[in-house]
Amino acid sequence: MKILVIQGSPDAESYSHQLASAYADEARVAGHDVRMIDLATEDFDPVLRFGYRQHMEDENAPMRYQEDIAWADHLVFSFPIWWSAEPAILKGFLDRTLTPGFAYRYIGAKSQGLLEGKTAALIVTSRAPSFIYRLFGGPISRWKQMILGFVGIRLTKTLMLGRIEQDVDTPSYRAAFVEKVRAYARG
């Protein structure tokens, strides 16, 4: 399977970065063809300065990301949840990459996702307990329905570790979650 891993934390030394790398490494060992976009290290302006009415001066990175998305069968997003949403750099990636004509189009008043047939997984961390998002929805349901679902991508798996930087957050707590991520990558 062709897998694209998108690491969405702006911090190259973050736990989300570690999780994305663990998934990518394990998926390669399992025989998958893996590419990774590491937004913490990319030279990429995440600000959509003119909406979609005008192209920005440098479209090289978004065009490369679109090529990677078109290539992939499965996308894996790894990111922390901050203020009930993804980090700004990941939001900017979505804004500049999942553009009209590439990811979706409108036919009259109806939208059509153009990335149908692709699947995705979310690997997320949060300071809040995980059950809060299962109970109230929030960012996970938004990603499933209003981001991925809107462009035709089917969310097949969500791995979430809550209570990061809380009393239960120990090295063994995090290591157990890394192993869960590795097991998912193995299939």
Predicted regions and their residues:
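N-terminal beta1-alpha1 ligand-phosphate binding loop
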Residues: M1-H32, I37
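Short, glycine/serine-rich, charged loops/turns that create anion-binding
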Residues: P10-D11, T41, R127-A128
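Short, glycine/charged-enriched secondary-structure capping and boundary segments
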Residues: Q18-S21, R49-Y52, L90-F93, L135-G138, ...
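A short beta-strand-loop structural module common to alpha/beta enzyme folds
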Residues: H32-D43, L159-G162
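N-terminal beta-loop-helix "entrance" segment that forms/cooperates
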Residues: L39-E57, T170
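Glycine-rich, highly charged phosphate/nucleotide-binding loops
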Residues: R53-W71, R174-V181
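Helix-loop-strand module that forms the ligand-binding subsite of alpha/beta enzymes
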Residues: A61-K144
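Glycine-rich phosphate/pyrophosphate-binding loop and the adjoining helix
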Residues: R134-G187
